[in-house]
């Protein structure tokens, strides 16, 4: 096998042109290409699977997903990006495992627009408009920058931990959406494709998730 330790940038970014190169290398048995792909996506896969499963089960599902990728790569037709295809396999296996363990409902059952609308909302003026050229739907007033003193750096680390705690406390559906949108920085279309939700529902769920995380962070600073 070729001794390839990493993917070229275009391929690592998951574009369609790069996808073809990666798929060809995987089909040819390029171990280096597979390891690079595994290193690139496994952390995000584990975070997503952990939205529904305990850590040990999530790790097993990630391993099962990679085995399925290797077995199914010759059947990959390129109708979606390679990344979307991999994460769709992960999502399906996560749902199956979670249902088998009696831990949760399918994602579609968790996304209830009427229940989302009934939740306490944050003033819409606190968000940038949908047509904002750079940061649509993001907070209009971001948190102020922290300084460089040891105390301020400690506060930054503590606040990051508090943000993760707030994300971990979200309902499964909201946790998945905010993880993919804000932690992994996926495009909305990719999130909708992998999770099987509409663009409208994705926006609603993300808004609710961000609102809860923001409230938790504001409470943290009030108490700090």
Regions found by a protein language model. Give the residues of each.
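Residue-level preference for hydrophobic side chains embedded in well-ordered alpha helices
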Residues: 37, 41, 45, 65, ...
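Short, Lys/Arg-enriched C-terminal cap helix and immediately downstream tail that follows
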Residues: 2-6, 99-102, 170-175, 210-224
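Amphipathic, Lys/Arg- and hydrophobic-enriched alpha-helical face
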Residues: 38-56, 71-72, 167, 173, ...
């Amino acid at each position: 096998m070729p001794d390839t330790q990493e993917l070229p940038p275009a391929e690592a970014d998951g574009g369609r042109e790069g996808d073809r190169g990666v798929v060809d290398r995987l089909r040819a048995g390029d171990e280096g290409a597979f390891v690079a792909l595994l290193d690139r996506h496994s952390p995000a896969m584990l975070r997503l699977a952990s939205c529904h499963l305990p850590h040990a089960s999530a790790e097993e599902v990630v391993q099962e997903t990679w085995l399925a990728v290797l077995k199914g790569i010759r059947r990959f037709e390129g109708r979606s990006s390679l990344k979307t295809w991999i994460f769709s396999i992960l999502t399906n296996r996560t749902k199956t495992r979670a249902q088998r363990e009696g831990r949760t409902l399918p994602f579609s059952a968790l996304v209830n627009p009427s229940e989302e609308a009934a939740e306490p909302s944050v003033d819409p003026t606190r968000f940038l408009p949908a047509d904002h050229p750079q940061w649509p739907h993001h907070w209009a007033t971001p948190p102020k920058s922290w300084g460089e003193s040891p105390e301020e750096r400690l506060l930054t680390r503590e606040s990051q931990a508090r943000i993760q705690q707030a994300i971990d406390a979200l309902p499964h559906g909201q946790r998945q959406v905010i993880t993919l949108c804000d932690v992994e920085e996926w495009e909305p279309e990719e999130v909708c494709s992998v999770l099987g939700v509409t663009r409208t529902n994705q926006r609603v769920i993300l808004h609710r998730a961000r609102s809860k995380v923001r409230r938790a962070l504001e409470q943290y600073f009030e108490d700090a």
